[in-house]
Amino acid sequence: MAENQKIQQIDCTKVPEPTLRRLPWYLSNVKLLKQRGERFVSSTQISKEINIDASQIAKDLSYVNISGRTRVGYEVDALIEVLEHFLGFTEIHKAFLFGVGSLGGALLQDSGLKHFGLEIVAAFDVDPTLVGTNLNGIPIYHSDDFLKKMEEYDVQIGVLTVPIEIAQCITDMMVDGGIKAVWNFTPFRIRVPEDIVVQNTSLYAHLAVMFNRLNFNEIK
């Protein structure tokens, strides 16, 4: 790392959510540039690759407090390191998954999640054809065994992929059992205590946005 390049992390809770959503895009792009042999990268270079204004990129990167060289930019290796650390990708966060349907099963088979710091160590369902089996080496237990498994695993994150009708019920069970953060893939807005972290990722909502923009473009 260059001597005149300073890296210092700040309180992540002060970072706007839109910035947190963009930082992984920058990280992925910088990794691609590294594969191409680039040693330094500027906000302008990243801007051209991902079509985000260079001033916005520079502002976003200011939250992780990394300063580059004048007329040269950021050192690629240093930028990758600080972004991965800032985003929590350098540590493994263990998680339980609830609901081994099509989406849940796909997440269990997504080995790429571990590269971003998330390891699903067990899954829960009530389907007798699934309970007692494993998928991608991940054991599937009955939902009734959740509390017992919480004693065996060091888990704070729950991934919610159950039917919408039981989303709140399963969420309550998770929170009562000690889960501190919920990655919610259902279209239901779950209710949790203030100290519980919730990240809503509704595929249907993203579809609605895409369809709306597609229709708008067609009638222009």
Swiss-Prot record:
Binding residues for NAD(+): G99, V100, G101, S102, L103, G104
Classification via SUPFAM superfamilies: NAD(P)-binding Rossmann-fold domains, Winged helix' DNA-binding domain
GO biological process, one term: negative regulation of DNA-templated transcription
One Gene Ontology cellular component: cytoplasm
DNA-binding residues: 25-64
Keywords: Cytoplasm, DNA-binding, NAD, Repressor, Transcription, Transcription regulation
Cell location: Cytoplasm
Main location: cytoplasm
GO molecular function, one term: DNA-binding transcription factor activity
One Pfam assignment: Put_DNA-bind_N
PANTHER family, per database record: REDOX-SENSING TRANSCRIPTIONAL REPRESSOR REX (PTHR35786), REDOX-SENSING TRANSCRIPTIONAL REPRESSOR REX 1 (PTHR35786:SF1)
Described function: Modulates transcription in response to changes in cellular NADH/NAD(+) redox state.
Subunit structure: Homodimer.
Family: Belongs to the transcriptional regulatory Rex family.
NCBIfam families (UniProt xref): PRK05472.2-3, PRK05472.2-4, PRK05472.2-5
Name by which UniProt lists this protein: Redox-sensing transcriptional repressor Rex
Taxonomic lineage of the native organism: Bacteria, Pseudomonadati, Bacteroidota, Bacteroidia, Bacteroidales
Gene behind the chain: rex
